[in-house]
């Protein structure tokens, strides 16, 4: 938000069209020319025609409901029986890839209760006691549901990821996009 505030202060005549949606498709939207700039998680491999500026890094966390349920009876154990725990995971986000890798490394085939689009859907379903989810801590911290969810102390922790802004290199030819990118660079240099 600070980036947008700085941009609006410096360039008040420029109108910003902001869309929210599934972060998993953010990089694809830039590649397809559907968006000039997107907020995205740093992918394991960034396509060579894209630029990425990290804004922050956030841990990925396992979350469970606070409300007593079958799920809490499993997650309250000192040794969580992961094969029995119903999981609510993103259909295709980086968080899903990291969760899959975490389970595979332990030889666990998780029980998938639901595959959803978007981290907010994971928060809602976990809150209801449907299962355990994996979300960026940043998403949990900003959620109105955070008091109804708890972070599980899981070792080893999932690999955190960087969140940043992504754009196609060709879009730097646009003065508006270039001005926004310069604000990002100025912020990173502060």
Residue positions per predicted region:
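Alpha-helix/helix-capping structural signal
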Residues: 24, 43, 67, 94, ...
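Residues at or immediately flanking beta-strands
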Residues: 13-17, 109-113, 162-164
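Beta-alpha-beta core module
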Residues: 47-58, 72-74, 120, 124-169
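Secondary-structure junction motif
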Residues: 70-78, 84-106, 173-177, 181
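Alpha-to-beta junction loops
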Residues: 14, 31-39, 60, 126-132, ...
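A late-sequence structural motif
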Residues: 2, 152-190
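Central regulatory/effector-binding core of bacterial HTH transcription factors
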Residues: 1-45, 116
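Alpha-helical segments flanking ligand/cofactor-binding loops in enzyme cores
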Residues: 27-28, 53, 78-80, 123-124, ...
């Amino acid at each position: 938000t600070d980036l947008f505030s700085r941009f609006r202060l410096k360039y008040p005549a420029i109108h910003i069209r902001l869309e929210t949606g599934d972060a998993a498709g953010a990089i694809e939207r830039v590649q397809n020319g559907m968006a000039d700039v997107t907020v995205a998680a740093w992918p394991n491999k960034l396509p060579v025609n894209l630029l990425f500026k990290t804004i922050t890094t956030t841990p990925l966390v396992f979350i469970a409901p606070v409300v007593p349920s079958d799920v809490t009876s499993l997650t309250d154990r000192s040794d969580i029986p992961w094969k029995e725990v119903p999981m609510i995971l993103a259909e295709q986000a980086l968080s899903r890839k990291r969760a899959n890798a975490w389970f595979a490394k332990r030889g666990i085939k998780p029980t998938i209760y639901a595959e959803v689009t978007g981290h907010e859907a994971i928060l809602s379903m976990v809150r209801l006691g449907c299962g355990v989810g994996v979300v960026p801590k940043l998403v949990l911290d900003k959620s109105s549901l955070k008091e109804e969810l708890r972070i599980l102390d899981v070792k080893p922790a999932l690999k955190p990821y960087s969140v940043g802004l992504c754009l196609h290199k060709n879009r730097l030819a646009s003065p508006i996009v270039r001005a926004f990118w310069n604000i990002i660079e100025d912020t990173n240099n502060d």
